Amino acid sequence: MFVILLCRIIIQSYKMNTVIEQTIQFKGTSASALFDIFLDPKKHSRIHGGAVAKITRIEGDKFSVLDGNLNGKNLLIVPDRMIVQSWRGNVWEENDLDSILTLVFSNTKTGAQIYLTHSCTPKQFKELWRKVYWDPIKEFLAEQD
């Protein structure tokens, strides 16, 4: 049984072996404000055009965002500094491993930045981050001015 499980894990690691690393700059905002967008259900919902977001700031809590299309668990929360979560899309195959997302927030001279590492994820997620998160967050912040 162990050998079968190990083989499945190896196969899945080849299928979803992409590691995405991105550093995104946001002008005129703070690390704290960016952190809030990810873990405040109302703000998270707003950046996605009202899609339901059930999320908390509590380590160990499960979450569901994008109208239930993305689910996971808060693995580590360092207020205003870091979020580590497991992620699973509702279209992933049953045997697919959960991906691990790490977001590190920091202030810069002109605003703030997010350093993202997303491991064990489908390749198409790289471009989806810009479309689904970075561009909508920038639009949301512009509306706040």
Label each residue range with its predicted role.
Residues 9-54:
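Hydrophobic ligand-binding cavity/cleft-lining segments
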Residues 34-35, 44, 63, 74, ...:
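Hydrophobic pocket/interface hotspot
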Residues 51-61, 65-66:
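A solvent-exposed, acidic/Ser-Thr-rich amphipathic alpha-helical stretch
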